[in-house]
């Protein structure tokens, strides 16, 4: 899959996520894409005697080319004898490449759009650009400057209370099995994300624990306290369209999603996908512990990860 971004014009995310009921019980909770042509400002929608949400569908005659709700339901899946439930699902995530276009990271217009649309502040964009350039230099191992550059980065971030260098290697060799923990976390449980150092001790050199990657954009949440939003046992494979089960369950935390501050070639992506957390990366805390929370707002979507 192309690791760079994708462009989707005239679209936004709302405070709505897919509940997975139409897709085999998928628990990923992806944010939904909404074309602006499908939406209407509340101030305009409420000027009539009743809103369009209350309108009777029979009031609007359907033409031959109209798409009904039944048509949409039928289009969500097809037969797939090789899958666990005999279905191949089609959703916005599985079909992303068909309705978006390639967006190279060097296209400056996307960053201008991030700022002018309100998706990002100027300060956040500048921090992301500084990190991207610093990382590019720090990974030049052949010049022998990678290690001291990463050390300097960590020292500076420690002084200002920032995020440590988020792209270090895990401690476990790839040919060894990574550890697991069974906390049996349930929705509503209060947990603290372990330190980055503790999490690296559970990852192999490819930054994976039992096949699940720990992303650089999860590092800012290390040490923070959140409630468990849901467990993840089933998810829709975006490449195959098949429902799959996790051999080692994970959880989603409330108010925690990818901020795309450290994403390679996808800086500033507004998709805000929920991060998945192995239980070994978390620890229970007392109910009296203050919770860190963030709000998921309406965002413009002009780029998205492929």
Report residues per predicted region.
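Generic structural signal for buried aliphatic residues
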Residues: 188-192
